């Protein structure tokens, strides 16, 4: 059971929900430059499994690492933290 707790958990924004049962999540992280101490922003996109197609474009979601579900999917949707506001 402790193995499951070692899996990576990220919070990011949904940038694509066009695929069936799959969303693309943009995760932004900050790292400090060793020499200059400036914070540098890094971003990466993850394909994420969304079983019920519940996440929509612009939502803030929490994703967790899991076994490989396809050639590119390695994460699954845990929860929708904040829903996007549609104007």
UniProtKB/Swiss-Prot annotation:
InterPro entries: NA-bd_OB-fold, Ribosomal_uS17, Ribosomal_uS17_bact/chlr, Ribosomal_uS17_CS. Gene3D superfamilies: Nucleic acid-binding proteins. GO terms for cellular component: cytosolic small ribosomal subunit. Keywords: Ribonucleoprotein, Ribosomal protein, RNA-binding, rRNA-binding. SUPFAM superfamilies: Nucleic acid-binding proteins (SSF50249). Belongs to the universal ribosomal protein uS17 family. One of the primary rRNA binding proteins, it binds specifically to the 5'-end of 16S ribosomal RNA. PANTHER family: 40S RIBOSOMAL PROTEIN S11 FAMILY MEMBER, SMALL RIBOSOMAL SUBUNIT PROTEIN US17M. Part of the 30S ribosomal subunit. This is Small ribosomal subunit protein uS17. The gene is rpsQ.
């Amino acid at each position: 059971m402790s193995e499951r707790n070692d899996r990576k958990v990220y919070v990011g924004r949904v940038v694509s929900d066009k695929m069936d049962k799959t969303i693309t999540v943009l995760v932004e992280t900050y790292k400090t430059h060793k020499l200059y101490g400036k914070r540098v922003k890094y971003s990466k996109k993850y394909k994420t499994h969304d079983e019920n197609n519940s996440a929509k474009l612009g939502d803030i979601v929490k994703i967790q690492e899991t076994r490989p579900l396809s050639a590119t999917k390695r994460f699954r949707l845990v929860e929708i933290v904040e829903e996007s506001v549609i104007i």
